[in-house]
Structure formats: structure tokens, C-alpha cells
Amino acid sequence: MAMSDEAMFAPPQGITIEAVNGMLAERLAQKHGKASLLRAFIPLPPPFSPVQLIELHVLKSNFYYRYHDDGSDVTATTEYQGEMVDYSRHAVLLGSSGMAELRFIRTHGSRFTSQDCTLFNWLARIITPVLQSWLNDEEQQVALRLLEKDRDHHRVLVDITNAVLSHLDLDDLIADVAREIHHFFGLASVSMVLGDHRKNEKFSLWCSDLSASHCACLPRCMPGESVLLTQTLQTRQPTLTHRADDLFLWQRDPLLLLLASNGCESALLIPLTFGNHTPGALLLAHTSSTLFSEENCQLLQHIADRIAIAVGNADAWRSMTDLQESLQQENHQLSEQLLSNLGIGDIIYQSQAMEDLLQQVDIVAKSDSTVLICGETGTGKEVIARAIHQLSPRRDKPLVKINCAAIPASLLESELFGHDKGAFTGAINTHRGRFEIADGGTLFLDEIGDLPLELQPKLLRVLQEREIERLGGSRTIPVNVRVIAATNRDLWQMVEDRQFRSDLFYRLNVFPLELPPLRDRPEDIPLLAKHFTQKMARHMNRAIDAIPTEALRQLMSWDWPGNVRELENVIERAVLLTRGNSLNLHLNVRQSRLLPTLNEDSALRSSMAQLLHPTTPENDEEERQRIVQVLRETNGIVAGPRGAATRLGMKRTTLLSRMQRLGISVREVL
């Protein structure tokens, strides 16, 4: 016969329901959680036997909730395995919620009696409604917590996605990602290890300064070869390590040593995989070993997947900007190369002073020695520098020029040595300096006498050590550059006046070249005048083929304080104002000290005689045929006692200059 509900919940003999309710009602009514529910049973009123531990096992969730008589409570996934004298196990039917099991445990004293078990069984039945209500609340709380967790996970993924989509610059990207990860997880360290083919190092470590308000991201060289990184990149699987478990690895791996020095106890390395490419890894560390739960690791893997895409995009953008800069530099270098292709044979002269100078140029060009070109303004120092470069083994590498007087002192250091991003206000990108651009080639430092004193030690260091440091950077960059300096100032006098460092002067003055002013080589003026006339006439589409004798006399009688540059400007103005085929030289230019008259200098008369006749196409063709014939007779040999220059009665450089002007190639002639 089935037991009625009244009989089922009736108290055992000797127990009044009022006594039990009076003691349990207040505790059971609280129902603030598992501990409150179990706490209602300890201590039990007489005639219940005392217990030291109560354990509730909910089969649906498979959790064990324990409450001790000392007031402590524990949630576990396995039942109590500690010392016990006896226990009493009782099933609790929860309807649609399944079953639970209540254990009353005695850890010391005597064993339970049958009456104890009867009392415990009755208690298990009367708490069924309370337990059912509590489980319903618990399920709702669990569902709510899951929804909140999903919401938080979705939020952090959205924030990370927004961060990676809003930046193409790698520095800003990593800084924003580090800030979002730190904000959500509270990690002590967020870093990235990325491969960088632009640097000598295989990998660079990007460490975020999480203590700063702007969460700055600071790239640095890898401290050494990391076994942990190699393993992660090879397997393409996350690697989690704890210092307490892997002490041997933490004492030897450079990445882990760096983290340990900052107080970190656990580290997670997640590969950044984008397609078939793994450019690096996300390095996370914390002072606790419990933060990297399985759930957090899965979320961090999703974050790493988004970061990998962003890093790929940032790298592609950086490659595009580098390519753009490279193309601009290449365009500049090609323009410079067109000018630097002018060798000694293209320098117009016939004076002995220039012949002696160019012999020195020919000697020094074959070495890597530093050259200091001195001379007045307008004497052609840059032309000589280009000739040295063109005759050197570096001719196929760039010739880079910088005018030290034309750039403000505040910008000159950046132009020479470059700067890293953030080195100063407005430095939004990394900038390569002229030394880096000229690597492998030649750097021409024009107007070196105007180099500020504060930059001279840095230039001296580059000349000595062959390495530079960008402005705002800490990494040394080796450079292989041949330096040619030029000045129109008296550097030695500047050294004595303490306006120029003596040690830098000696470094630059390895092979000095002194360019003669135009007034000291007047025999070159007719040739230069003819060259500039032809050049300007072609440029202005004028048919000017003669220079009057009187015009040449007057040109050769001036002292030319502006030297060749001034002569070129005078000829340009004359060509501009000429309306016929004979150069109309306007003499409204100030005349200063006159040079010796033509009658007193046979060299000047000889120079004049070569230019008194008009330069006609017929004369050019005759000269061309004569040079071609002699080249064929000498088998293309230009210099030497059997060369064409000797047979034609002219210097080698003069012959080469005329061959270029007339379009004669030895290869085509033979």
C-alpha cells in the first residue's frame, strides 16, 4: 500500500515537526546558495547525531557541494575522499530536474545508528521542495552567466576587430590590440614576436608598456634564439607554459627569462597564422598561473586569428609604402645617375691646372678614400665629385647628394641619419637618412663647412665606425658609404677659430683636391663659352653657331668671382637676348680686376684661335670622319703612344669629349 504524503513527511518518533521547523525554517528560507542551504543542517538539533560534513551531489551538473562544521565550503567535481568514520547516503528526487544525493559524513567519533539514518532520510525528503527551487534558480543563474560571458566575448572580439581595422601602421596596431587584451583579461604582459625581413634580425619583439596611459608599443631586437617560439611556429599550435612546471625552460629561453624578470609566472604563445603564412606569434604572460583557462585560451585564439589578418594587412601596406619610397629614391638615383655618368672626358678644359687636377681625380677614384674638394663657389666641385664616383668601383651604386647649408640645422640630423617613428613631433613614419640611401655607393656632402658643431661628432663616428643610429632609435645600422665632402670655406681657419672640429677635419682631409678658380685658367674660358652657347641654344631652340672675337676677348678679360657658374649665367642671358646666329654678348655686367691682355699670353691667343671660326655642321662632320678613320687605324685604342689621341695631336680627355659630342662609339666604329 502506497504511503501518503502526510505519512512521508511525518517526523520520526520522538521528534516534533515544530522543533525541527523552528530551527531550520529561518536557515532554509535564506536559500542564498549552496553553502546557505547546507549550512542549515549544521549543527543539527537533538536527537540528531552530530555530523562534521554534509555533501550534496547534483547528478545533472555532476558537481559536489560540501559544507564543513568549521564553516568552510567547497565545490568539487569528485566526491569527498578524506578521512571518515561513517556516512549516510540518501537520494533526493527532483522531478524533471533529475536526482541529487545527500551525504551526512562523520569524520570522528562513533558510527551512525539506524535511528540516525532514519532521521537523515526524513530530512532529505523534507528539503526536496527547497532544493528544487534552489536548482531552478541556479539553472537560471548559470544561463544568465553564460549569456553575459557570450556577450563579453562578443564585445572583446568586436573591440579587437575595430582596433585591427582602424590601423595600418604596425606600431599603432599592436599598441591598440595590447590595450584591448589587457583591459579585458588584465594580463601583466602583452607582446608580439614578428619576423622582419627589413632588418638583420630574424625576429623583432614588440613589447607594450601597459603601465603607460597611451600603452606605447616599443619594438626591440629579440634577446636570442627562443626554443618556445620555434616550437610554436613549427607546430602552428598554441604553447602554454608555467614557470613552476617548466623551470628548466624558464631559466634558459630568452623570451621566458625576459618575462620572469618582470615577475610573470605563466606564458601563452599563440601563432599568428594567415593562410599558409605564420609571420610571428602573440605572446601573453601573467603573474598568476590560473588565468589561462581552457575557455580563455580558446577566446585568445579567436583574437589571435583576427590579429594575424591585421598584421598581414599592415605588412602589405608597409611593403607598398616601402616600394613607393624605393621607387621615388630610384627615380632620384636615376636622375642623379644621368648626371653622374659625366666622367673626366666630359669635363671641358685645356689648361694645365685642370689636367693636373684630373690626374689626381683619376688616382683617388679607384680607392674608397674620403675626398675633400675645396674651391671657390661655382668652380665645379659637384662635377668633380660626380667624376670621382663615375670612375670608382661604386659607379653602379647610388650617388647621393646633400647640401649641408641648404637644410635647417633642426632637420639636418634627420636627413643625414634618418629617424624612427615617434622620434619627434610629426615623425609619423620611419625615415631613412642619406647614409642609408647611399649604402654601397657614394655620399656627397656639399658645403661641409656649414655642418653644425653639434652634428660633427656624429658624422665623425660614422666615418670611424661605419655605422649610424637613427634619430630616436637605439639600434646601430652598418653602412658602406664612400664620403666625398666639398666646401668653399677655409676649414683649417675654422678649426683654429673653433668653428670646426679638428678631428673631423683630419678625417675628411684624407685626399684633398683644390679646384683652381676660373681666373687662374683663362685658357678654358673659350671652350666653356662655346659649350654653354651650344647647350643653351639647343635648350632654347636657337640657331647660334658663332661667338664674336670681341665677345671672347671680353669674357677672357674678366676675373669671374662666380667662376664657371657665373660664366654659364652670362652665356644663358646672352643666348636669350640673341636674335641672329652670332652670340650677342651684353656687357652690362660689372667688370672687376682685368686679367692679362691677350697679347701678353700666347695660351690665350691659342685658345681664341680655336673659337674664332663658326661651329658649323659641315665642320663637325669633317672632324667626325677624321676621328672615325684614326680610331679604325688604331683598332679603337684611344690613349697611349699608339692611340688615336696621340695621332690626332690632342689629349685623351679632349678626344673622349669630342667623341661624345659627335656621337662616336668605339664599338660601332670597329
Curated annotation (Swiss-Prot):
Any single GO BP term: phosphorelay signal transduction system
DNA-binding region, residues: 641-660
Alphabetical UniProt keywords: Activator, ATP-binding, DNA-binding, Nucleotide-binding, Transcription, Transcription regulation, Two-component regulatory system
Induction record: Induced during anaerobic growth in the presence of formate; part of a hyfR-focB transcript, it is not clear where the hyfR promoter is located, nor if the upstream operon (hyfABCDEFGHIJ) includes these last 2 genes.
GO terms for cellular component: protein-DNA complex
InterPro entries attached to this UniProt entry: AAA+_ATPase, GAF, GAF-like_dom_sf, Homeodomain-like_sf, P-loop_NTPase, Sigma_54_int, Sigma_54_int_dom_ATP-bd_1, Sigma_54_int_dom_ATP-bd_2
Residues that coordinate or bind ATP: 375-382, 438-447
Motif extent (Cys-rich segment, might bind a metal cluster): 207-221
Its job: A transcriptional activator of its own operon; when overexpressed operon expression is strongly enhanced by low pH (under pH 6.0), strongly inhibited by O(2) but only weakly stimulated by fumarate. Expression in situ is very weak.
Protein name per its UniProtKB record: DNA-binding transcriptional activator HyfR
